[in-house]
Amino acid sequence: MANDPIHQFQVSRWIPIDVGGVDLSFTNVSAFMVATVVLASGFLYLTSSGRGLIPTRLQSVSEMAYEFVATSLRDSAGSKGMKFFPFVFSLFMFVLVANFIGLFPYFYTVTSQIIVTFALSLLVIGTVIFYGFFKHGFGFLKLFVPSGVPGIIVPLVVLIEIISFLSRPISLSVRLFANMLAGHITLKVFAGFVVSLSSLGALGIGGAVLPLLMTVAITALEFLVAFLQAYVFTVLTCMYINDAVHPGH
């Protein structure tokens, strides 16, 4: 069981809850999602409550995260898109903290569950659709008719644009889920090699050096991937929000 690279993604029911035949149990995934929100909120509170003129290192990290999201949203959707800043910033911090939490031993990576990443993606696309129709009415549908397209191929282009739009939550969720899943499986496999070889005596310990070095290298790479996936998720969210703010562009 310890060497099974898939076991780390198992969903365990901690508090069974059944409501009308619907399983609403509190699981390890639920617990670490709550932990993610608490840690992210606590970090932002502690780093934003300082009164000193010179920011601490943690304050600087918090400010960089703020500026990154604000700049990405402003560049993608303009000043009108800044009303979505709390939403996008919350998504960024949740994905980032969830990714980092999962890199520590015995901690769960909630973003390795497709149901979690797909729910986040549906939240993004649902917000885009709701705001698009709320703000522009049926003018939001201009999103599916790019300007300058010859009339004869408009039906084909509209069909392609609709399929592309509907595939966004799938691509957005699978990208995050697959990267976190693959990275953790690879890390677990190399760590398993280290444990297995070390149990073979002196010769095995010598042979475990290379897998150990690979494990350290992959761990460092996973921290980079954890940030990059939060970065990509946020940038794409900003681009999708631009479609809701400026559907005719």
From Swiss-Prot:
Q: Got a GO cellular component term for this one? A: proton-transporting ATP synthase complex
Q: Which residues form a coiled coil?
A: none
Q: Which CDD domains match?
A: ATP-synt_Fo_a_6 (cd00310)
User: Which key words tag this protein in UniProt?
Assistant: ATP synthesis, Cell inner membrane, Cell membrane, CF(0), Hydrogen ion transport, Ion transport, Membrane, Transmembrane, Transmembrane helix, Transport
Q: Which PROSITE patterns match?
A: ATPASE_A
One GO term in the molecular function aspect is: proton-transporting ATP synthase activity, rotational mechanism
* Subcellular location field: Cell inner membrane
The annotated topology with respect to the bilayer is: Multi-pass membrane protein
Q: What is its main location?
A: membrane
- Spell out where the chain crosses the membrane: 26-46, 84-104, 114-134, 143-163, 185-205, 208-228
Q: Which InterPro entries match?
A: ATP_synth_F0_asu, ATP_synth_F0_asu_AS, ATP_synth_F0_asu_bact/mt, F0_ATP_A_sf
What Pfam families does the record point to?
ATP-synt_A
Classify the source by domain of life: Bacteria
Task: Write out the similarity annotation.
Answer: Belongs to the ATPase A chain family.
Instruction: Report the protein's function.
Output: Key component of the proton channel; it plays a direct role in the translocation of protons across the membrane.
Per UniProt, subunit arrangement is: F-type ATPases have 2 components, CF(1) - the catalytic core - and CF(0) - the membrane proton channel. CF(1) has five subunits: alpha(3), beta(3), gamma(1), delta(1), epsilon(1). CF(0) has three main subunits: a(1), b(2) and c(9-12). The alpha and beta chains form an alternating ring which encloses part of the gamma chain. CF(1) is attached to CF(0) by a central stalk formed by the gamma and epsilon chains, while a peripheral stalk is formed by the delta and b chains.
Cross-referenced HAMAP family: ATP_synth_a_bact (MF_01393)
Q: What is this protein called?
A: ATP synthase subunit a
Organism lineage reads as: Bacteria, Pseudomonadati, Pseudomonadota, Alphaproteobacteria, Hyphomicrobiales
Which gene is transcribed and translated to give this protein? atpB
